[in-house]
Amino acid sequence: MSLQLETNKRRTFAIISHPDAGKTTVTEKLLLYGGAIQMAGAVKSRKTDRSATSDWMKMEQERGISVASSVMQFPYKDVMINLLDTPGHEDFSEDTYRTLTAVDSALMVIDVAKGVEDRTIKLMEVCRLRDTPILTFINKLDREGKEPIELLDEVEDVLKINCAPMTWPIGMGKRFKGIYHLYNDTVRLFESADGLNASEGELIHGLDNPELDQKLGSLAEELRDEIELVRGASHEFELDAFLKGTMTPVFFGSAVNNFGLQELLDGFAKYAPAPEGREASTRFVKSDEGKLTGFIFKIQANMDPKHRDRVAFMRIVSGKYEKGMSLKHVRIGKDVKIAKAITFLANKRDQAEVAYPGDIIGLHNHGTIKIGDTFTQGEDLKFTGIPNFAPELFRRAQLKDPMKMKALQKGLTQLSEEGATQLFRPIINNDLILGAVGILQFEVVAQRLKDEYNVTCLFEPVNVSTARWVIGDKAEIDKFLAKVKENVAYDAAGELVYIAPTRVNLTLIEERWPELQFVATREH
């Protein structure tokens, strides 16, 4: 099949949500609809308790982190879907943000009772950096929650994105009877389903169908009135606005009951964009170019000390990957033979034979690959848009054995290049300050320092609230350094960073130094 045809079939996306909105359940059920049924079945057997296919990022010491489930590829109708998992709860990390730089669209999952929550707002800000198209699924309609129209207002108000309802719920909680599809003019009646069957639910064609009155009684007339109101009061779906990231199509349902997801997946396959290409520092690389290009957005280490292998995740931007091909690792200027790339089809960690734009392949990495690295078939390219994000949590590294200082510095430098943490060295002392966006990142770093560098290290609280990279002309920066050097550090790449003791302090500094920029992201 031609490169163009294969590329057009690809849909690469991630799910953004607040913990407990149902992301894991939605992921599982999408796999079910994608025919990866063995995965939904394997969910219960993997551990004695009910653990889910995509929840892999617990520190699974005994057998290492299962890399396979961080990317799940499955076919649905005539498209091939690549779902990138975004760790949610306490294992939230900068990886979650960076994963969003490697997708072409995102699915926002919202709990009907809770509406828009903090984490969703943060993840949405990251999607905004690239105007990523967003689809929305409002989940848990089998429970009581906010009125649908109120939820749409909240999404529009808080996230500044127009909502276009595609499906509409008929009641909720105990009165939940199904959903109406505004564009297909069909009603799907609700039936709860067990975990392993895709729920069909009876389909009634036409809002004026008398069968609706038989099934729903007085609710049918209420539904007709409500739909008339909804059509008048809400936005009509515009594909162009969706692709620009200014409008989100909204679907309602109950993931735990496999209900409403088929409409969502159909909409996703129909409207979500295929891979188009990506901006590099010198030019725009189109997905249909013949030569392979790709970039690294994540590196995942194996937590098993016996297996030091790390896997670098590469998003293919253009061309076709074929097993055994040689690629240029642009940053180090070397050609490397990619003999054993990993592919992620239906949760089998297999060797990739071929892969196309939009696909993710795993490269075995022995410490030479960094986040943001570009691979090509010879051209000196550097893809942009894979940033470091300003950390939100900070700790100072304290050594138990001062003789291990060199090993600690080496370990922290390498781990920061890999994206496990960020390292800041204050100008005025020898402190090593670590930054992260999720608390588990510190535990992972401590464990890896011990296993891989034989360094025992404690992390203690430090008086830093937030960090910003400082950009400006040299004369202004020199003046700045002379005045505030006690709060200035260098990151692992040698870039200047202001480490603010409080948010208020940061605001004051920004006001006092209007010629300088204090930015929350920095390109790798």
From Swiss-Prot:
Primary localization class, coarse:
cytoplasm
Q: Does the keyword Flavoprotein apply?
A: no
Residues that bind GTP, according to the entry? 17-24, 85-89, 139-142
As given in the record, the signal peptide range reads none
* Keywords associated with the record: Cytoplasm, GTP-binding, Nucleotide-binding, Protein biosynthesis
**Where does it reside?**
Cytoplasm
Q: Mind telling me which InterPro entries this protein's record contains? A: EF-G-like_DII (IPR053905), EFG_III/V (IPR035647), G_TR_CS (IPR031157), P-loop_NTPase (IPR027417), PrfC (IPR004548), RF3_C (IPR032090), RF3_dom_3_sf (IPR038467), RF3_GTP-bd (IPR041732)
Q: Where is the tr-type G domain?
A: 8-276
Mind telling me which GO cellular component terms the entry cites?
Answer: cytosol
Q: What does this protein do?
A: Increases the formation of ribosomal termination complexes and stimulates activities of RF-1 and RF-2. It binds guanine nucleotides and has strong preference for UGA stop codons. It may interact directly with the ribosome. The stimulation of RF-1 and RF-2 is significantly reduced by GTP and GDP, but not by GMP.
Q: Please give the name of this protein.
A: Peptide chain release factor 3
Q: What is the lineage of its organism?
A: Bacteria, Pseudomonadati, Pseudomonadota, Gammaproteobacteria, Thiotrichales
